[in-house]
From Swiss-Prot:
It comes from Escherichia coli (strain K12). The lineage of its organism: Bacteria, Pseudomonadati, Pseudomonadota, Gammaproteobacteria, Enterobacterales. It comes from the Bacteria. This is Uncharacterized protein YdjO.
Amino acid sequence: MFSTNLIQSNYGDLNIKSLAFDSFKERLQSTMTALTFFISTGQCDCDEIAESNFNYMIAYMSNINYDASKPGAPALSFDTYLQDNVKYRVIINNLYGSEIRIRGINKDFIGMDVTSVFRPEKMTNLISIKNRLVIHYLRTIYYEQNYIHPVGSIFAAIQKNESLLKFPSIISMLNINLLFNPLNLPGMGSGVLEDIMSIPDSSLRKRLGYEVLSFSLQAHSLSQECIDKLDIFFADDLFKYESVCIAAMEHLKSKATAPIQNGPLPA
């Protein structure tokens, strides 16, 4: 179910043409529709325009925040942009573990609030959703010397050096330390580690692997199930001969005394 609510703009003196507003409204709603489809199915919309809008949203995610302060309604939010450099914020609420509400809010330009409320067939928590969004982004970038570019025809401006992400700025931009939570079972059951290993670029896979290892070492204790998953992950040829990984896994195995943790770690 979608509802679109127009709110009063604080910039009425800008004399925004209705055509520009209609374009903004259409693209924002297309992006939110594609995001809903992605959360529900784990796939991108087959429509090329919707997928382009969705990829652009993922490419410019920043200020990612997970807020569990409201009982029964944790929220995942992040800032992003539309193609014409219009900034907006996405807020995803997991209402009482059942319905998911997505809002696309732009307060500084043409004020509009696009809301989607739905009940996905396969329930998942917000930490898992965040992981899946970032993994999708990492799988849709390509490298050119020291630069990385999001894929898609809509990124012609980026390819003209108008906006570039210099490796490894993507790591800090997406706050990787907060994205992968080995204690978050069943969040790990959604295949986060498997998805990391499916990323084509081996140097990026290795970088993310070490981030996972670093984050795991900071945990006070780990469940045996979590240790088993990490053991399989670090048995890959990228890591299994690395002395740092071998020593770290031995240390982690000594911490395998805790029951399975079902909730996310605090940020």
